[in-house]
């Protein structure tokens, strides 16, 4: 990555603030942000360096349902921009509903890997982790 001039850095900052709707929290300290605001700031900070991949650790933890939908929409937009995303999360439906491929770790080892549908349909996965009544809910982001 080519270093940015101070002017380019400021331009990128303004673009990310606009893209993630962070105007009202621009001068707030991190400990004053809601869970959803914090997640949007975290993702915007990652994008400041124009990455090919980002990792989101528990992005759906501690956020309200509206923020979950917002984060899912952001992830869908990042996928459209060909940015790879690695998500680690215990919120199974929220995560599987937006993933192309999933890896389930159980007792420190990969128990299963495949699409969300394959994972949800696997008998061993249901027995060890999901439970027999688990229902996969997929998201559609047609209006990005």
What are these regions (language model features)?
Residues 50:
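Conserved catalytic motifs of ABC-family nucleotide-binding domains
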Residues 54-58:
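Catalytic Walker B motif of ABC-type/P-loop ATPase nucleotide-binding domains
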Residues 6-25, 76:
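Conserved ABC ATPase "signature" region
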Residues 29-33, 37:
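Conserved ABC ATPase signature
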